[in-house]
Amino acid sequence: MASRSLFSISISPSQFTVLPSINNERRRLAIAARSHRLSRRKIRKRPPDRDMSSIVSIPELPRRRDSEESLLLDSRISVAEGDTSNTDVEGDRDTTSSIRTQPPPRKGRNLSSSRIKFYGVELSPDNVAVAMVYFVQGVLGLARLAVSFYLKDDLHLDPAETAVITGLSSLPWLVKPLYGFISDSVPLFGYRRRSYLVLSGLLGAFSWSLMAGFVDSKYSAAFCILLGSLSVAFSDVVVDSMVVERARGESQSVSGSLQSLCWGSSAFGGIVSSYFSGSLVESYGVRFVFGVTALLPLITSAVAVLVNEQRVVRPASGQKENITLLSPGFLQTSKQNMIQLWGAIKQPNVFLPTLFIFLWQATPHSDSAMFYFTTNKLGFTPEFLGRVKLVTSIASLLGVGLYNGFLKTVPLRKIFLVTTIFGTGLGMTQVILVSGFNRQLGISDEWFAIGDSLILTVLAQASFMPVLVLAARLCPEGMEATLFATLMSISNGGSVLGGLMGAGLTQAFGITRDSFGNLSTLIILCNLSSLLPLPLLGLLPRDSPDTLTKDDADVEMKSN
C-alpha cells in the first residue's frame, strides 16, 4: 500500500493530457515505470513490518464493510494509475488485503466513554427525565410546612382537624397498583408513560394554583391537597415503572446505579425544599409558597417529552390503539391482575409479614399536636422550623447509612425489636420539651428540638429500611413491581390509620390550638402504643438478611 502511495504521487493522469509529443509521453512512461520498479525494490528490502499501514491516511475514514473499503481503494488506484499500470496494481493486491484485515479502532467506541455520567448512569435525555421527576417529588416538600401554617393560622383549625386533613391527603398513595394497571393497559394519546407524566404535572400545577389564589375553607383545602397528592402518587408509579423497564436485562451494577440516581435526585430535592421552605413562608407568606409550588409540577410535564417511548399501535392493522377505562380489554386485564395479585398476597409467607408491617405502622402519633405546641407555645418561627426540617432531611440519609453500615447483617426480628424499643424510649424525650425540663438543664428549646429531631429521624429511617427490604423479599418473580407497590400501599394505609387514631386521641384529651395540658400524656400513650406489635414478631421471617440477594439492597429507598 506504501508503493501505491508513492506511485500515485509520481504519476498523475493529468500529465498525459497536456504533453504534445507522443515520444515525450513514451519517455515519461518509461521513466515513471522505471522509478516505480525502483521504489518497489526499495520497499521489498525493508523488514516485513506491518506497521507500514500507519502512514496511510485511509484509517481516518469510517470503516463500514470490507466491500466498501475495496471499492474505495480500487477507485483511488484507477484514478491515480490510469490504464497503464494494471500489472503493477495486481501485484500489490496481496499487501492491500493483509492491511485490510487489521482495521483501526472505531471512533464510536471512544465517544461512549466520553459521555457524562452521574452515579454511574449515562445522562441520556431519557435518564435525565427520570431523575428530574424524582427531583420534583422531593422538592414538592416545599409546600408541606406552608400547608401546616395555612391550616393553623389562616383557617384556624385545631390539631385534630389538621391531622385528619393530613391523613386524607395520603389516600391516593393507598391505591398505587391501580395507577400501574391504568398506565400499563390504557395508553393516553398513544403513550403509556409520557402522556401520564404530562397529565400528572398539569394536575399538580392546577391543584397548587387553586391553593395559591382561591381556597378559603377547610373542605376546598382538603380537596386541593388531595389532588396534589394524587398527581405525585401517579407520577411516582409511572416513573417507577420506567425505572423497572430500564433496569430489566441490565447488570446488577447498572440497576443499582439507576436506583442510586433516583434516590439521590429525590433526596437532593428534599434538602433543597427543606432549606427554603421556612424562610419563604416567613418572608412572603403561604400563598406565595403555594404559587411557587404550582410551577414545580410543570417540570414533570416538560421533561416528559424527553422520555424515549414508542407510540402504541395495534399489531394487526398498525393503527393507533384506543383503549378506555371501560373497554373490555382493560377490565379483563385488570381482573386477571387482581386475581394474580390476591393469589400472591394470600400466601402465608407474604400475608403474615404484611400484616405485621401494617400493624407496626398503624400506631397513633402526635405530630400535629406537637406542631401546634412548638409554634403557638414555644414560638418557633417558620424559618427555624425550616432549618429543623433540613436537619431531619440530612438525618434521614444518615439513617440509611446506619442501616447499610451496621444493620444489614442483623436478623429482621432483632432489628424491629431493638429499633422499636429504642425509638419508644427516645420518643419520650419530647415530654422533656413539653415540660420545660430542658431549660433547667441549660438547654434552649431550639437546640433541644434540633437534637431530638436529629436522633429520632436517624432511628426512624434505620428502622424503616427493613420494611423496604422485607417487602422486596416477599415479591415473587414475575410481579415484583405490582406486589411491591401493593405492599407499600398497605404500609401507607397503616400510617394513615395511625394518623387518624392520633387525631382521635388528640380530640379526646382536649388538646386544642391553645390548650396543651394533656400533651405529655398523649406523647407517652402514643410512644407506648408502638410496643404493641412486638408480640407479633413471630410473623416475620426467621432468617437473617445475610441470605438476601444484592437486588434487595438496591430497593428504592422511598417511604412513599
Curated annotation (Swiss-Prot):
Disordered: where is this region? 82-110
Spell out the Pfam families in the cross-references: BT1
Query: Transport: present as a keyword of the record?
Result: yes
Q: Which GO terms describe its cellular component?
A: chloroplast envelope; chloroplast membrane
Q: List all membrane-crossing ranges.
A: 129-149, 162-182, 195-215, 219-239, 261-281, 288-308, 339-359, 390-410, 415-435, 450-470, 483-503, 521-541
Single GO MF annotation: 5-formyltetrahydrofolate transmembrane transporter activity
Q: Which residues carry this modification: Phosphoserine?
A: S67
- What domain of life does the native source organism fall in? Eukaryota
- Read off the transit peptide span from the entry: 1-30
Cite a single GO BP annotation: methotrexate transport
SUPFAM superfamilies the record matches: MFS general substrate transporter (SSF103473)
- Lipid bilayer topology: Multi-pass membrane protein
| The entry's keywords | Chloroplast, Membrane, Phosphoprotein, Plastid, Transit peptide, Transmembrane, Transmembrane helix, Transport
Q: Where in the cell is it found?
A: Plastid, Chloroplast membrane; Plastid membrane
What tissues has this protein been observed in?
Constitutively expressed at low level.
User: Knockout: what is the outcome?
Assistant: No visible phenotype.
Its job: Mediates folate monoglutamate transport involved in tetrahydrofolate biosynthesis. It also mediates transport of antifolates, such as methotrexate and aminopterin.
Q: Its family?
A: Belongs to the major facilitator superfamily. Folate-biopterin transporter (TC 2.A.71) family.
Instruction: Tell me what this protein is called.
Output: Folate-biopterin transporter 1, chloroplastic
